[in-house]
């Protein structure tokens, strides 16, 4: 899972980089592994800054001063399979045709065939293990078919038809053609989110933004916004004070199935994705979870409800209200430690849990505690939290998950774990409780979770992580290749890759 952002300003003399930086901070929760930014200045010249680390560390004042131009894109990377190196920070760039930069959120599930096609048929060199580079080169190859001196909107839309035809998976992309435009597009199933917004300036001109979540748009006064539809694309001209953005339904919508895990965990609660309030869904999750708790544990056996900060707070508070039990903030969070399941290895995840959360003993001592978290993935965080609760004096610990049991790979951009590393893999709920060291584990049912999120327009979601049935299907050998690449990256973590990838356009990459 990643955060992507693109901004085109009407004032051609203005500098977009500071606003891209601010927007990146609003999307930092979507990717803490690497950050990158590319801008377009006069005569179509591109400028870039990217590297491993948080946005505030990568985008230093010295580097930002070199990012000129009124149009640009940004990316926050969450480490998926094949993307742990500094050289794999995005945006990616190809100089031919026309000079293209691309930021990609999601994962392609037919990478084996795409890599062969790019090598054997169109003879494009792929320099990294990232599927984002594959997607960019498929688009570049399709655009090159036109063999024209200058590109136009129809050429871009036709090239995107080729991308949709060849690329399978969940993806949302923001790209930039040097000196010409921004563009954005979304996969035909709407698995990954992408929103478009506009902001009216005092002189009547308009600025435009593309972003992964609505919270970025609202924070920057892009108050008129909407979701791109599945299979839809938009082109925003660089000189957007003279030309309007153009939208086109490039391919028909296959289905409208946003990833359910966005609402459970990944998105900020103050975002609205596909017309669905993340905060509202989490309130509903708390109500449904309370009903599931009652089926497993007598409420009289619970003295207090405790949340695991931060994502589970909304759900836990509502759960406590419906159980008529006191709610307590019994874990204090260190906000300078990243999300634990994003950590690159097990040892780091275990130590990170204790650095991240500190229990207040008096909230646990001699109490029977229901702990509510958004999900249980590997069980690393859950097990340590349960241990801390018992060390602090809890007499019984029940553990409730706002999500159903996760027993399968997430293949569309949230690199949770290999299937066999998931604590619920090949285990019953009682066996999970035994593994975690608590009295009972209570999972939300999938049916209830869907009910919490659905609307009149969207009543189905991508739920493969819970069921093993993926909306796009996967090519033969993909899951095995995914696990092979993960294992390879794990082995390479001790051997640093090249610090900077090859790129002649890196004028601002110091």
From Swiss-Prot:
One of its GO terms (molecular function) is amidophosphoribosyltransferase activity. This is Amidophosphoribosyltransferase. Its EC number is 2.4.2.14. One of its GO terms (biological process) is purine nucleobase biosynthetic process. Residues 2-239 form the Glutamine amidotransferase type-2 domain. Keywords: Glutamine amidotransferase, Glycosyltransferase, Magnesium, Metal-binding, Purine biosynthesis, Transferase. It comes from Lachancea kluyveri (Yeast). Gene3D superfamilies: 3.40.50.2020, Glutamine Phosphoribosylpyrophosphate, subunit 1, domain 1 (3.60.20.10). It comes from the Eukaryota. Mg(2+) binds at residues 373-374. The gene is ADE4.
